[in-house]
C-alpha cells in the first residue's frame, strides 16, 4: 500500500460502526463454555434502564473492555456478560414523571398491571438506546448472553434465594424502625440514605409532673414528635432528677401520662440532661423503648403528614405541625426557648426527601450469621480489593453491619414470593416455584400475595449467578466461568452492591462471586461560577465554559472548582457527544488515563483533544511505515531477519519493547489502567516514533547503509508495528484494528511456518482474522548486547550535545550540520554515527586528530570525545551583528544601573528590596555581557 492511499488524518466516523459490525457479526465476542482455554469472566455492572449512559458508565465499561480484550488476546476463554438493571425506585419514579408529563396521569390512576406494562415499554426503549451506546464505545460483550435483572431467569433466582434464606431463618418479617421516604412512600436500606449537615434549632419544652408542682424541662430538635412520646429519660446518676424516677408527666395535646425512666444512654450534659423518648420515630429512642418495654406510638402517615394519633394536629405536614405545636406550647406556658443547633439530616438518595425514622412492618435479611464469612473472604485475600486501602473500609462496614431491610413499597420490581392467609396474617406461604402455590390455587379467595417488592439490590446481589445461568445450570456457564475474575465498579457502591453480592452468592453456592474487586474513583468535572447582579452564585455554561475548559485564562470574577458531575453546575460531559467529536478511541484513552487509584477523577476536557491527536499520531506513524514497506510480503517475514545486520538502535527498540511488555503485565495485574495507558502512549510516541523511526529514516531513504540494511529495517518496522499496535489494541481498538486489516492486506496471507525468533510471533498475529482474536504480543527472543543501555545513553548524550550547540549558536533547526569528532585513543563512536546523524541533523561528519584552525566552530565535550560544529560564514556575519547590538544594550544598562547604585541618595531613600533588585540586575547583565564577549571572540 502506498503512503498516499492513507488519508492524512485519522477520521473515525464511519470506520467505527463498520468495524464493530464486523466483530459482532463474526461471533468474535461469543464465549464457549466447552472450551479448553482457561476461563476469564466479568459481569457488567448493569446500567439502570432509566435513560442513557453517563460518563461513569463509559468509564466502568471501558476499563472492563480493556481487560477483556487483553485477556482474550492472551489466550483465555473470555466471557463478558452484559445486562441492564430494572432499578426499582429509580425507574418507577422516571416512568411516573413520564406518564404525568405525557398523559397527565399519576401511578394511582392505573391498575398495577397497567402501570407495569408502561414500565416494560419504557424498559424496552431505554435498554435499546443503552446497548447501542455500549457498542459505540467498543464494548466487546458477549451479546448472546444479555441479561436483565427482571427477566424470568432472574425472577427464578430471586425466588429461590429468598426461599432458601427464609427456610433457614435468615429472612424474617417484623416491626422495625426503618428509613422512610415520604415522597416515594417506601422504606430504604441504611446505605440508601445520605446525610447532610443543616442549620436547625434545639427547642426547650416543659413537662408538668403529675400530682406535683414540679416540672422537668427537656431539649429536642423535633418538637412535633412530642405527640408520640412514651417516656422522659434521665441518667440514673443525675442527682438533679433522681428523686423524679418513677414519677409521671402529663403529655400535652394527647391527654397521656408518660413515665420518667432512668437510662445510662442519656448524656447529662446534653441540653438539660433530660430527653423525651419517642420510640416510633428515633433510632436511639427505639432501642430505649425496647429495653424498657415502652409502647410505640406512630404519629406519621406514609405521606409524612401527622396521622390520627396526633389528635388536633392530624392531617398537618410535620413542618406545619411543628409551627402550631410551638405556638400552642407558648400559649400554655410550656415553651422555654430555642437555640441554634447543627443537625445531621438523612435524605433519600433517590428523591432527596428528608428521611423519617418510621415504625413499619418490613422484611429483613438477618446478617449476623453471614458476618464472619463476609469478613474472612477479604481478610484472607480470597477476594482482593484494589486499591487495597478500601479493604479497611469494607471490613469496618461489615463489622458494623445491621440487618438489611429488603422490602419496598413499590409496584416495579420482584414481588415478594410470600402469601398471607386473610384470616391469619401469621399463616404464610413462601413459594419459589412457577405460578402460585398449590394451596393458594385451591382456595384463592382466602390468600393474598405480599404487595411489596424486593429491594433492587437483592436481585443485583445475585447478578454474578444469574448472569451465568443460575439456578439453571444446563448451559455449563456456571461451572466454567464462576467465580468470575474481577468486578469493576465505583467505590461509592462498595456497600450497596459489592458486599451484598458476596453475601447472597456465597449463601447460595458456597463460593465467592469474584476473585478481585477494582474500585475506581468518581468522576468530577470542572465548573465555573460568578456572582450575578443579585449577589448570587451562577454557573457558567455553553461556549464560555468550553473556552475555559480548553485553557482560556479565567477573568478575576470567575471561580473554578472540581465538582461532581451535575447538570445544574453545567459540568456534565456526555460520553456520546465526546465520541462523536473525538472518536471512541480518544474517549477510551482519556478515561483509562484518568482511572487513578484515588477517590476522585478530575476529568480534564483537554485530554479528549490530546488523545484524539494521539490516535492521529498512531495513524500517521503507521502511514509513514506503510509508505516504506509496500514492497514487503509475508514471505519476506517468513525468511526472517539477519541479526548480524541489526544496529544499536534496533537492539534498543527491541529491548525496550520487551521491557514494556513486562511493565504492562504488572500493571494489568494491579489494575493500574492509568499506567497501562501512559506506558503504551509514551513508548509509541517517544521510543518508537520520535527516536527509533527518526534514527532509521536515512537508511529507509537510502542515505545510509545498503539495500540489505534497508530491507532489514523495513522488516523490523513491520514486525514492530504489528506488535505495538497489538499492545495498544485493548485501549484503542478501532484505529489499531483498521491498521491491522490494512497491514494484512499489504503483506498478504501467511501460509508458511516461520522459525525466526523476531518475526515468528508477528506472523502468528497476522494469521488471525482480527486483533480481537489475535494472540497478544510476546517478548521477542533476541540476545541483547550487555553494554546496550550504556552505549545508547552515550549516544543520546552525543546527540544532546550537538542539539545544544545548535541552540546556543541559534542555528536554523532545519539546517544540516557539518561536524568533526576528536576521539581519545582507543575509543570509537562508529556504532553511534547513524543515530547521531539522524537525530542531530548532521550532513557530514569527519574524524580529526586536532581542532581545526582555519574555520569557526563551537565545541562540546562528552566523556573526552570532542564534538565540533562548524558555523556557516553567512550565519557568523548575521550572528556577529546580533551580538554586537546585544552587547551595546547590556553595556548601556550596566552603565545606567551602576550610576544609580553609586548614588548615596538613591541608596538612602530607596526601598531595600528595590536596591537588591538593581544589584541582581547588574550582576546578571555583567554575566550576559561576558557570555556575549566570549561568543564574539570565538568568531575571530
Swiss-Prot record:
Keywords: Aminoacyl-tRNA synthetase, ATP-binding, Coiled coil, Cytoplasm, Ligase, Nucleotide-binding, Protein biosynthesis. Residues 872-938 form a coiled coil. Its EC number is 6.1.1.9. A motif ('KMSKS' region) lies at residues 564-568. The keyword GTP-binding does not apply. Its main location: cytoplasm. GO terms for cellular component: cytosol. Belongs to the class-I aminoacyl-tRNA synthetase family. ValS type 1 subfamily. Catalyzes the attachment of valine to tRNA(Val). As ValRS can inadvertently accommodate and process structurally similar amino acids such as threonine, to avoid such errors, it has a 'posttransfer' editing activity that hydrolyzes mischarged Thr-tRNA(Val) in a tRNA-dependent manner. HAMAP family: Val_tRNA_synth_type1. ValRS has two distinct active sites: one for aminoacylation and one for editing. The misactivated threonine is translocated from the active site to the editing site. The C-terminal coiled-coil domain is crucial for aminoacylation activity. This is Valine--tRNA ligase. It comes from Chlamydia caviae (strain ATCC VR-813 / DSM 19441 / 03DC25 / GPIC). The gene is valS.
Amino acid at each position: 500500500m502506498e503512503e498516499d492511499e492513507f488519508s492524512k488524518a485519522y477520521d473515525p466516523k464511519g470506520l467505527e460502526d463498520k468495524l464493530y459490525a464486523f466483530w459482532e457479526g463474526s461471533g468474535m465476542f461469543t464465549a464457549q463454555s466447552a472450551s479448553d482455554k482457561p476461563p476469564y469472566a466479568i459481569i457488567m455492572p448493569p446500567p439502570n434502564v432509566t435513560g442513557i449512559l453517563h460518563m461513569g458508565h463509559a468509564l466502568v465499561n471501558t476499563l472492563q473492555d480493556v481487560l477483556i480484550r487483553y485477556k482474550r488476546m492472551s489466550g483465555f476463554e473470555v466471557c463478558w456478560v452484559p445486562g441492564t438493571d430494572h432499578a426499582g425506585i429509580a425507574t418507577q419514579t422516571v416512568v411516573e414523571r413520564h406518564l404525568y408529563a405525557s398523559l397527565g396521569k399519576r401511578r394511582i390512576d392505573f391498575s398495577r398491571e397497567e402501570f407495569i406494562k408502561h414500565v416494560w415499554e419504557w424498559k424496552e426503549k431505554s435498554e435499546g438506546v443503552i446497548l447501542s451506546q455500549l457498542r459505540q464505545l467498543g464494548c466487546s460483550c458477549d451479546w448472546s448472553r444479555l441479561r436483565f435483572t427482571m427477566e424470568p431467569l432472574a425472577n427464578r433466582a430471586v425466588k429461590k434465594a429468598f426461599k432458601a434464606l427464609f427456610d433457614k431463618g435468615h429472612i424474617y418479617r417484623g416491626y422495625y424502625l426503618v428509613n422512610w421516604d415520604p415522597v416515594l412512600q417506601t422504606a430504604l436500606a441504611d446505605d440508601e440514605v445520605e446525610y447532610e449537615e443543616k442549620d436547625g434549632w434545639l427547642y426547650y419544652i416543659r413537662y408538668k409532673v403529675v400530682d406535683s408542682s414540679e416540672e422537668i424541662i427537656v431539649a429536642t430538635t423535633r418538637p412535633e414528635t412530642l405527640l408520640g412520646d412514651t417516656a422522659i429519660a434521665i441518667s440514673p446518676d443525675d442527682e438533679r432528677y433522681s428523686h423524679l424516677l418513677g414519677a409521671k408527666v402529663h403529655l400535652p395535646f394527647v391527654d397521656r401520662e408518660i413515665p420518667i425512666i432512668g437510662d445510662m444512654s442519656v448524656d447529662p450534659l446534653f441540653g438539660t440532661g433530660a430527653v423525651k423518648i419517642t420510640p416510633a420515630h428515633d433510632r436511639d429512642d427505639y432501642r430505649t423503648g425496647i429495653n424498657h418495654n415502652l409502647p410505640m406510638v406512630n404519629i406519621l402517615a406514609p405521606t409524612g403528614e401527622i396521622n390520627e394519633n396526633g389528635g388536633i394536629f392530624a392531617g398537618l405536614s410535620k413542618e406545619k405541625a411543628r409551627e402550631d405545636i410551638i405556638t400552642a406550647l407558648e400559649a400554655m406556658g410550656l415553651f422555654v426557648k430555642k437555640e441554634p443547633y447543627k443537625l445531621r439530616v438523612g435524605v433519600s438518595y433517590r428523591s432527596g426527601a428528608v428521611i423519617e425514622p418510621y415504625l413499619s412492618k418490613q422484611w429483613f435479611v438477618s446478617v449476623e450469621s453471614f458476618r464472619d464469612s463476609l469478613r474472612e473472604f477479604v481478610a484472607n485475600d480470597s477476594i482482593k480489593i484494589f486499591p487495597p486501602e478500601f479493604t479497611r473500609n469494607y471490613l469496618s462496614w461489615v463489622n458494623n453491619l445491621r440487618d438489611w431491610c429488603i422490602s419496598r413499597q413499590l409496584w416495579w420490581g420482584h414481588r415478594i414470593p410470600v402469601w398471607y392467609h386473610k384470616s391469619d396474617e401469621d399463616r404464610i406461604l413462601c413459594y419459589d416455584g412457577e405460578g402460585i402455590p398449590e394451596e393458594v390455587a385451591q382456595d384463592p379467595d382466602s390468600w393474598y400475595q405480599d404487595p411489596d417488592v424486593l429491594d433492587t439490590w437483592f436481585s443485583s446481589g445475585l447478578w454474578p449467578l444469574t448472569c451465568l445461568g443460575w439456578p439453571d445450570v444446563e448451559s455449563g456457564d456456571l461451572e466454567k466461568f464462576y467465580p468470575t475474575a474481577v468486578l469493576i465498579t465505583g467505590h461509592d457502591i462498595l456497600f450497596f452492591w459489592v458486599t451484598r453480592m458476596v453475601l447472597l452468592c456465597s449463601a447460595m453456592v458456597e463460593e465467592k462471586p469474584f476473585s478481585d474487586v477494582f474500585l475506581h474513583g468518581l468522576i468530577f468535572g470542572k465548573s465555573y461560577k460568578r456572582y450575578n447582579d443579585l449577589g448570587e452564585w451562577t454557573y457558567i455554561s455553553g461556549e464560555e465554559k468550553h473556552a475555559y475548559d480548553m485553557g482560556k485564562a479565567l477573568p478575576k470574577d470567575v471561580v473554578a472548582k472540581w465538582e461532581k458531575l451535575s447538570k445544574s453546575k453545567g459540568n456534565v460531559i456526555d460520553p456520546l457527544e465526546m465520541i462523536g467529536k473525538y472518536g471512541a478511541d480518544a474517549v477510551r484513552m482519556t478515561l483509562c488515563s484518568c482511572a487513578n487509584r484515588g477517590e476522585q477523577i478530575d476529568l480534564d476536557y483537554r485530554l479528549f483533544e490530546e488523545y484524539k491527536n494521539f490516535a492521529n499520531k498512531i495513524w500517521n506513524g503507521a502511514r509513514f511505515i506503510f509508505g516504506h514497506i509496500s514492497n514487503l510480503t509475508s514471505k519476506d517475514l517468513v525468511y526472517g531477519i539477519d541479526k548480524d545486520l541489526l544496529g544499536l538502535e534496533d537492539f534498543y527498540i527491541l529491548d525496550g519493547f520487551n521491557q514494556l511488555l513486562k511493565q504492562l503485565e504488572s500493571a494489568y495485574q494491579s489494575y493500574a489502567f492509568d499506567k497501562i495507558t501512559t506506558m503504551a502512549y509514551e513508548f509509541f510516541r517517544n521510543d518508537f516514533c520520535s527516536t527509533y523511526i527518526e534514527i532509521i529514516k536515512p537508511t529507509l531513504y537510502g542515505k545510509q547503509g545498503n539495500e540489505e540494511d534497508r530491507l532489514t529495517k523495513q522488516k523490523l518496522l513491520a514486525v514492530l508495528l504489528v506488535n505495538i499496535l497489538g499492545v495498544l489494541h485493548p485501549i484503542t481498538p478501532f484505529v489499531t484494528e483498521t491498521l491491522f486489516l490494512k497491514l494484512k492486506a499489504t503483506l498478504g496471507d501467511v501460509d508458511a511456518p516461520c522459525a525466526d525468533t523476531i518475526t515468528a510471533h508477528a506472523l502468528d498475529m497476522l494469521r488471525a482474522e482480527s486483533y480481537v482474536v489475535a494472540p497478544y504480543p510476546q517478548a521477542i527472543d533476541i540476545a541483547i548486547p550487555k553494554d546496550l543501555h550504556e552505549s545508547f545513553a552515550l549516544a543520546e548524550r552525543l546527540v544532546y550535545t550537538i542539539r545544544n550547540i545548535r541552540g546556543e549558536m541559534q542555528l536554523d533547526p532545519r539546517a544540516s550540520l557539518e561536524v568533526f569528532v576528536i576521539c581519545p585513543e582507543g575509543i570509537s563512536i562508529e556504532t553511534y554515527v547513524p543515530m547521531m546523524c539522524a537525530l542531530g541533523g548532521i550532513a557530514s561528519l569527519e574524524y580529526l586528530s586536532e581542532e581545526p584552525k582555519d574555520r569557526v566552530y563551537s565545541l562540546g565535550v562528552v566523556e573526552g570525545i570532542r564534538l565540533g560544529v562548524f558555523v556557516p560564514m553567512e550565519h557568523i556575519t548575521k550572528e556577529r551583528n546580533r551580538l554586537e547590538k546585544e552587547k551595546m544594550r547590556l553595556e548601556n544598562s550596566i552603565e545606567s544601573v551602576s550610576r544609580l547604585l553609586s548614588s548615596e541618595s538613591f541608596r538612602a531613600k530607596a526601598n531595600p528590596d528595590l536596591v537588591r533588585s538593581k544589584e541582581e540586575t547588574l550582576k546578571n547583565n555583567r554575566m550576559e555581557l561576558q557570555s556575549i564577549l566570549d561568543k564574539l571572540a570565538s568568531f575571530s
